[in-house]
């Protein structure tokens, strides 16, 4: 069948997940005249990593994730990375609050719930680490109100399942901060996409697989699309393309032929949770309890026992158990990894394989892990867990970045990176962590990278500051403004907030 006629649009968003939905919402707020098309291979939005059960749903603010606070050689704790992640989540909170304020999202309870964030450790060395971590973090206003205890009875109050049945033979410790959240990113994505396509000039096309990206003379992009249901092909021309396709971003970036993408590769990691839906068990646990990963293990191995609230129902999640699959997407192909190999990224791929043997060994061990081994890991956080109450839940795929490096040949990075054209007409989001929680930060980074000329006082800047009042201000440095922002967004989002110290209240009010 001949290709359908070409279509013209200002913006094409590839992938209907939380990243594309967030960027699309930002762009339409800043420039209502923009025409935007979203292209998704599957038959609905949020079916890959954004799906409710394909991620842990943690509102990642680096409250409880100890891998963000490494110990320096001198024994002190470095909280710089944690602070950065912490205030990046504030950007998302402000963005969501803005959308609720203008009626784009009716009820925050449809996607976000207050759930305390906890860190839990056992053993003398780990207890000492958590004590030092708490001292460093609680001294900063971003972690004001964090609690710490080494009393098993207090921990049992905070997280009964964690302590019930635990022997008192070794020391334990925990921190808690009540401002933590559980976020249903699947529900949020549906809300954002629904809001976007309700506006003039915006549309989402499902069952639309992007098969080619061609740069035309004049700087526009021609996006070749195949309808997976009918087999028909068509093309769309756009001034700007964002590839927010999760694990599928790398193959699409390679299709673009951009020299800036040369040498990049991907390392796919699969994941499995244990899931409990028994209401009698779940009502005894209301927290996200993160443990400390074993020495030398990768970031995705951090164990946690989480409250999840999805569709109004409470569940428990434990994991993750990592594994290896050559798929780049949960609905992808086992050939994804092999088809991503190019002459330019062979050296980086081989270098990463050489330098990360421990990671490979860890993943192989996870793949070969028996059910009894998985339950033994659960037992460390829920000593009285009964295997019959738990079932396996397959998580989404994560594709970590492999990038070329002059000295080592290639580097494996556990983060995200924007890679795109030098004229800023196309950009792809590569990587995975910390993921959906920082979607607003990533969207703003795209704006700064690709639409810098519009971020002026006479163009988009006033509106951007209306959407994100802290834009241009460091919440890490400005304690009063940070407290003010958090109090405001907590009220709108209906989540818990720690009241600011009475002596400091006038200063915050004055800033407002």
Swiss-Prot record:
Enzyme class: oxidoreductase
Enzyme Commission number(s): 1.1.5.4
GO molecular function annotations of the record: L-malate dehydrogenase (quinone) activity
GO biological process annotation, one example: tricarboxylic acid cycle
The reaction(s) this protein catalyses: (S)-malate + a quinone = a quinol + oxaloacetate
Pathway entry: Carbohydrate metabolism; tricarboxylic acid cycle; oxaloacetate from (S)-malate (quinone route): step 1/1
Cofactor section: FAD
Keyword field: FAD, Flavoprotein, Oxidoreductase, Tricarboxylic acid cycle
InterPro entries tied to this protein: FAD/NAD-bd_sf (IPR036188), MQO (IPR006231)
Superkingdom per UniProt: Bacteria
GO CC terms, sorted: cytoplasm
Presence of the UniProt keyword Cell inner membrane in the record: no
Family membership: Belongs to the MQO family.
HAMAP family per record: MQO (MF_00212)
Name this protein carries in UniProt: Probable malate:quinone oxidoreductase
Gene label: mqo
């Amino acid at each position: 069948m001949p290709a359908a006629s070409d279509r013209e649009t200002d913006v094409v968003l590839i992938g209907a997940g939380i990243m594309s939905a967030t960027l699309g919402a930002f762009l339409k707020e800043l420039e209502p005249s923009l025409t935007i098309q979203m292209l998704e291979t599957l038959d609905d939005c949020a079916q890959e990593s954004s799906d409710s059960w394909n991620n842990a749903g943690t509102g990642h603010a680096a409250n409880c994730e100890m891998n963000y606070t490494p110990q320096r050689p001198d024994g002190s704790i470095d909280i710089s990375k944690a602070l950065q992640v912490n205030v990046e989540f504030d950007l998302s909170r402000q963005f969501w609050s803005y959308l609720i304020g203008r009626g784009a999202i009716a009820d925050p309870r449809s996607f976000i719930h207050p759930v305390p964030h906890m860190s839990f450790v056992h053993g003398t060395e780990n207890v000492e680490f958590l004590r030092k971590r708490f001292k460093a973090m609680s001294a900063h206003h971003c972690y004001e109100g964090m609690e710490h205890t080494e009393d098993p009875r207090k921990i049992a109050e905070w997280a009964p399942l964690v302590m019930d049945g635990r022997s008192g033979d070794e020391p334990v410790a925990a921190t808690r901060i009540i401002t933590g959240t559980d976020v249903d990113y699947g529900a949020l994505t549906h809300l954002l996409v629904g809001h976007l396509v309700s506006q003039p000039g915006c549309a989402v096309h499902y069952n639309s697989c992007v098969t080619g990206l061609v740069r035309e003379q004049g700087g526009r992009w021609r996006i070749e699309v195949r309808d997976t249901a009918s087999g028909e092909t068509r093309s769309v021309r756009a001034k700007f393309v964002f590839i927010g396709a999760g694990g599928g971003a790398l193959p699409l970036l390679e299709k673009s032929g951009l020299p800036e993408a040369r040498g990049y590769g991907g390392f796919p990691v699969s994941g499995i949770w244990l899931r409990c839906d028994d209401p009698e068990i779940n009502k005894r646990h209301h927290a996200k309890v993160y443990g400390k990963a074993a020495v030398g293990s990768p970031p995705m191995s951090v164990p946690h026992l989480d409250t999840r609230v999805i569709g109004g129902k409470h569940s428990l999640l434990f994991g993750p158990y990592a594994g290896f699959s050559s798929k780049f997407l949960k609905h992808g192909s086992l050939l994804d990894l092999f088809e991503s190999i190019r002459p330019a990224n062979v050296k980086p791929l081989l270098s990463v394989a050489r330098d990360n043997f421990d990671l490979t060994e860890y993943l192989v061990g996870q793949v070969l892990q028996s059910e009894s081994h998985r339950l033994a890991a659960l037992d460390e956080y829920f000593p009285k867990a009964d295997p019959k109450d738990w079932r396996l839940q397959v998580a989404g795929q994560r594709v970590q970045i492999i990038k070329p490096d002059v000295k080592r040949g290639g580097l494996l990075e556990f983060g995200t990176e924007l890679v795109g054209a030098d004229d800023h007409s196309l950009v792809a989001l590569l990587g995975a962590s910390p993921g959906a929680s920082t979607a607003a930060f990533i969207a703003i980074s795209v704006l700064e990278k690709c639409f810098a000329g519009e971020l002026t006082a006479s163009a988009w800047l006033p509106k951007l500051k209306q959407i994100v009042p802290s834009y241009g201000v460091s919440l890490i440095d400005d304690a009063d403004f940070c407290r003010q922002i958090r109090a405001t967004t907590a009220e709108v989002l209906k989540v818990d907030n720690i009241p600011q110290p009475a002596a400091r209240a006038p200063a915050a009010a004055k800033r407002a």
